[in-house]
A protein has these predicted regions:
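Short, basic and Ser/Thr-rich N-terminal targeting/leader segments
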Residues: 38, 51, 77, 88-90
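Glycine-centered small-residue hotspots that permit tight backbone geometry or close packing
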Residues: 26, 41, 91-93, 110
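Ribokinase/PfkB-type carbohydrate-kinase core domain
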Residues: 1-11, 60, 72-85, 97-138
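Conserved phosphate-coordination/catalytic loops
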Residues: 35-39, 88, 110, 114
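Short beta-strand scaffold segments in enzyme catalytic cores
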Residues: 46, 92-96, 104
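Glycine-rich phosphate/adenosyl-contacting loop at the front of the ribokinase-like
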Residues: 1-60, 68-69, 128
């Protein structure tokens, strides 16, 4: 492949929590463990880079600590970040996963939901570039 894999798919911080059951309305349940990891477009970009494909993120990242950590991980994976920093931070996705694998998510929007047309238009596309747009961001 002579071009880059460019993804506009939003990147958010994912907090998966494994639980025994979904709580009733107004109830609560304890999670076995909680951890955090970047999700969304991060996964696709890092997979492309791991296969030797030049990869570039075109999803906004912010100035907050979650954005800082994700930006660092993207760079370590060999992914170029094409968009300017926005003031704020990326959103968070809380995933409740019960014992049979059923998942429910609670999503907060962050700077990843604010891509400006002007910032995207400043990205120079080259022959052979492939632009990935996720339907979930539309």
């Amino acid at each position: 492949m002579s071009g880059r894999f460019i993804s506009t798919h939003s990147v958010a911080l994912v907090l998966p929590m494994h639980i025994a059951y979904m709580p009733d309305r107004g109830g609560s349940v304890h999670a076995d463990a909680a951890s955090s990891r970047p999700g969304g477009g991060f996964t696709t970009l890092c997979a492309a880079a791991a296969m030797g494909v030049p990869a570039a993120a075109a999803s906004p990242l912010g100035t907050g600590p979650n954005s800082f950590a994700v930006r660092q991980q993207l760079v370590e994976a060999g992914v170029e970040v094409l968009t300017p920093e926005l003031v704020g931070d990326i959103g968070v996705v809380i995933q409740l996963i019960d014992e049979d694998g059923t998942m429910r998510s609670v999503v907060t929007a962050g700077v990843e939901s604010e891509p400006s047309r002007a910032a995207l238009e400043r990205i120079e596309l080259c022959e052979g570039d492939l632009v990935h747009v996720a339907a979930s961001d539309m």
